Amino acid sequence: MRVNRGGLRRSTAALLALAAVATGCSENPLTAPPPTIEPAAPAVAPPPATQPAGELLPLGGRPQAAIFDERSGSLAVLTPGTDPQSPATLTLFAVSGGTRELTLPGPATALAGGGNGSAYLSTRGGYFTVDLTAGTATPVSITDEADTDFTAIARRADGRLVLGSADGTAYTLGSATTVAEKVKIFARVDAIVTEGNDAVVLDRGQTSVTALNSDGRSQQALRAGEGAATMAADPAGRVLVADTRGGQLLVFGVDPLIERQAYPVPQAPYGLAGSRNLAWVSQTAANMVVGYDLTTGIPVEKVRYPTVQQPNSLAFDDKSDTLYVVSATGAGVQVIRNAAGAR
């Protein structure tokens, strides 16, 4: 068994720092807000020193997230409005060619897919459902949550949605509009992924991951490096976490939640995408993306490609072995075909 002693020392230091904050905040830590650290962020990428690999599609603005939907054969990219109250935009790139731009009914904070031809975007008071084939968006209000600032969203295998909020609550819906269970144990919910009907919540302020069972109740919670920033699930049931501050790729199993692998990835790892063959990680300080084979028990680098500037968002099409790299500075969408190649 491999022991990542450097990562262990860093995680212990982060944990001790959080414990010190907790001691100073309140004499009753059970009722105090969760202790937090400054959330990790991607590096400010320099201009690319090398021509990006593959093809480049134009896309301006400051895109925030991307998914690939196999049923509709399209890449969906979320770009926030120019201010927090402005409507967001969802840009759809079809594999068959052509681009459509859909202005959403309001601001959107996070994007999720389900492989069912739809996209789901969190917003204040609820979420939007987008039919990716028709290019139509439907707002959905969640009962009694009109003033809730939802910040994260994911779809379970049974079709139920899990959302998170800025005040640190995770909501498991019982129907399209009603809450079946909610737990308020986080500083903030920054990302959610699902594996079957279980969910995993990322809290950047606590640099932690927490499992929710099919009833929406919290299960195991683990520290995630020195500054976990992003999270993705892969087809093998693994949860990938980029420890941007600690310079690591963390790999978790879900049931139960357990850290299975920790591997050093320098240059501010941030963007993530899971695929059948490789785990993809972008290095924002270097404008690079790396594909790792996780099947040996320790990540093994198989391929790497130069990217567009600020490669914060990744998405992958397993059917065509195509990697999409989205620039967060308006440098476009990079399309790398046969990305995994002959391994």
Segments and roles (model prediction):
Residues 2-10, 19-343:
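Predominantly soluble domains enriched in secretory-pathway, periplasmic, or organellar proteins
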Residues 13-14:
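Long, low-complexity, charge-rich intrinsically disordered regions
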